[in-house]
Amino acid sequence: MSKCSADETPVCCCMDVGTIMDNSDCTASYSRVFANRAEAEQTLAALTEKARSVESEPCKITPTFTEESDGVRLDIDFTFACEAEMLIFQLGLR
């Protein structure tokens, strides 16, 4: 059997994990509108705690609060040290 590449594999639906996870995308984004800022801040605190539980190096957390007609929009970017941490964080939210 020859060495496999991402383009050809001897088994259906099989490829090297490095082909999928190459650390090119280490940022997870979150966006939601809340009734008030207090609810948005509670969610930010909970998501920050989840991010801190999977980080190997400090995760850069960038929240933005925007007043809208129907409440407060919370947008957050979580930038992890590696893509695996970002995936673990996202899967933990499901």
UniProtKB/Swiss-Prot annotation:
An example Gene Ontology CC term for this record: cytosol
Q: Which Gene3D superfamilies match?
A: 3.30.70.860
One Pfam family, please name it: DUF406
The record's annotation in InterPro entries points to:
DUF406 (IPR005272), UPF0234-like_C (IPR035571)
Write out the transmembrane intervals. Answer: none
Q: Which residues belong to the signal peptide in this entry?
A: none
Q: Which family does the record assign?
A: Belongs to the UPF0381 family.
Name used for this protein in its record: UPF0381 protein YfcZ
Lineage runs: Bacteria, Pseudomonadati, Pseudomonadota, Gammaproteobacteria, Enterobacterales
